[in-house]
């Protein structure tokens, strides 16, 4: 198959690599323009553009593909069999969708129609989903509304953060796209139309529709008056950027465990007394209620106490266990987070 690949973030890179190592031909790459990013706020290419440069592939970077007819004309000249689209970052217009002979196919990191939109991985964790996956969808003009050709599922792990889940979904996606292209090749070989494909309309899938909206700055700030379970999901889902304050310094919270029997296998200490202590504290959420050597600190929340095992204090390196304890107790005379 002759393919044009559309994508932008790091999530896409292994999928492009998989296609490049296959017996298929990647003709060109379309990605978002260079943008300011990183600590130095320098103008940098997208991860996909970096990979395409390494492979000497033709690259196009439309600001708005709908309006840029010159780029559309250049793409048309490739006469591609299919477009593979993974987190490109723009909605493709009908004039682009109709170009490839065997369709535009989007890999989406959720089990559609659940978590259509920009941040499906984060929202699956934030919402406490037990299962997620990836789907290969026939693209249409709507946002993630197309019929599904294939999907692969996985179970979320209790302490799995967004970075770890993303890696597992990348691996699934690499297998998914090769399987999907094999199906499309059979259609081509048999001179059949795409109407012969066994596609499932999303309205026929027995799942609740939900929208994975873009994340905002305020989503990353921990509210210690919230449930400990919700805070834990926030830390996992927004890894590694969830934060609080300690003596007016920003503190990223990287790892946590709710102190509850559901997480018993991860708690290497007796915690019943801590739960009793927590239950006796009223209206003091964010308080560090205990410090356990070689493990971490325990923080009061609305319901269950939360064990914090790894942090990054503003201007410091990541710290865990005793280094975390020393850093926070020296910084925080009031023994409280969120202030």
From Swiss-Prot:
Q: Which reaction does it catalyse?
A: L-methionyl-tRNA(fMet) + (6R)-10-formyltetrahydrofolate = N-formyl-L-methionyl-tRNA(fMet) + (6S)-5,6,7,8-tetrahydrofolate + H(+)
Q: Tell me the CDD domains matching this sequence.
A: FMT_core_Met-tRNA-FMT_N, Met_tRNA_FMT_C
Keyword annotations for this protein? Protein biosynthesis, Transferase
Which is an annotated GO molecular function term of this record? methionyl-tRNA formyltransferase activity
Q: Which domain of life is it from?
A: Bacteria
Q: Name one GO cellular component term.
A: cytosol
Binding of (6S)-5,6,7,8-tetrahydrofolate occurs at: 110-113
Known EC number: 2.1.2.9
Pfam families associated with the record: Formyl_trans_C, Formyl_trans_N
Alphabetized NCBIfam families for the sequence: fmt
Task of the protein: Attaches a formyl group to the free amino group of methionyl-tRNA(fMet). The formyl group appears to play a dual role in the initiator identity of N-formylmethionyl-tRNA by promoting its recognition by IF2 and preventing the misappropriation of this tRNA by the elongation apparatus.
* Family under the similarity heading: Belongs to the Fmt family.
Question: What is this protein called in UniProt?
Answer: Methionyl-tRNA formyltransferase
Q: Organism source for this protein?
A: Prochlorococcus marinus (strain SARG / CCMP1375 / SS120)
């Amino acid at each position: 198959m002759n393919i044009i690949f559309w994508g932008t973030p790091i999530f896409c890179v292994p999928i492009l690599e998989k296609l490049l190592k296959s017996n298929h031909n990647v003709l060109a790459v379309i990605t978002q323009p260079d943008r300011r990013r990183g600590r130095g706020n320098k103008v940098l290419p997208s991860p996909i553009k970096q990979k395409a440069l390494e492979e000497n592939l033709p690259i196009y970077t439309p600001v708005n593909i709908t309006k840029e007819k010159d780029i559309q004309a250049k793409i048309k000249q490739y006469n591609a069999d299919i477009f593979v689209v993974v987190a490109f970052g723009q909605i493709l217009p009908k004039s682009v969708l109709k170009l490839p002979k065997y369709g535009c196919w989007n890999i989406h990191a959720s089990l559609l129609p659940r978590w259509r939109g920009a941040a499906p991985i984060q929202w699956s964790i934030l919402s406490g989903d037990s299962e997620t996956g990836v789907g290969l969808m026939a693209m249409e003009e709507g946002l993630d509304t197309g019929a599904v050709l294939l999907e692969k599922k996985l179970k979320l792990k209790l302490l799995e953060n967004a970075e770890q889940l993303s890696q597992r979904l990348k691996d699934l996606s690499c297998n998914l796209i090769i399987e999907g292209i094999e199906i499309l090749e059979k259609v081509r070989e048999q001179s059949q139309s795409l109407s012969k494909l066994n596609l499932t309309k999303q309205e026929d899938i027995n799942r609740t529709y939900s929208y994975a909206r873009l994340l905002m700055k305020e989503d990353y700030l921990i509210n210690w008056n919230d449930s400990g379970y919700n805070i834990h999901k926030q830390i996992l889902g927004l890894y590694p950027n969830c934060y609080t304050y300690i003596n007016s310094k920003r503190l990223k919270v990287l790892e946590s465990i709710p102190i509850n029997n559901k997480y018993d296998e991860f708690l290497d200490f007796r915690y019943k007394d801590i739960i009793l202590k927590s239950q006796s504290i009223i209206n003091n959420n964010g308080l560090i209620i205990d410090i356990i050597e070689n493990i971490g600190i325990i923080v009061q929340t609305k319901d269950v106490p939360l064990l914090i095992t790894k942090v990054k204090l503003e201007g410091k390196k990541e710290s865990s266990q005793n280094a975390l304890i020393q850093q926070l107790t020296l910084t925080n005379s009031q023994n409280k987070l969120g202030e």
